[in-house]
């Protein structure tokens, strides 16, 4: 289901046809300033890789999967709609899917467009893609999964992560893939399949959505500096 920023419900096939796409996957629970700043930087980087005509037709989407890849649990449908309302209040288009795996999402988008696609993701999700438990039902394993993900000019745009314990700042270029996939990952970087997104806002990176959830529950006002005002009201 695709909810447009203007409140309309649309068919993805109609809206995305022949359009370049910038898509951010996330739970958006809650929607926070980090999501917005990273999305803006991903889009800026993506637009520098396509021509002006393509840039004019670029479609920005926030996607929420009803099967969360990192948590593996289902959540209440009304909660999904609340998150969608928060994103729409910020002028974002929202796609709700049931796809945990990136290769399935890439395949879905490939039905609608042959233009370049940027999928924005965090270091945490990038690390998750190398776990074999997600490809047990794919004959070709991780290699086939990545092959499907990168079909039709789809690229992964990876935002950095700040390790709050060690202070290490991890980017797509410094990310350490599992030992058996180090050379494969270097191939992805060298060929532009994985794109390093330049971003650093230490204040935002130090507070995860789960931190913000705890702040809201504890009635700590600092959460209001981490969540856009439009989402306060939604």
Q: How would you label these PLM feature ranges?
A:
Residues 1-234:
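Nucleotidyltransferase catalytic core that binds NTPs
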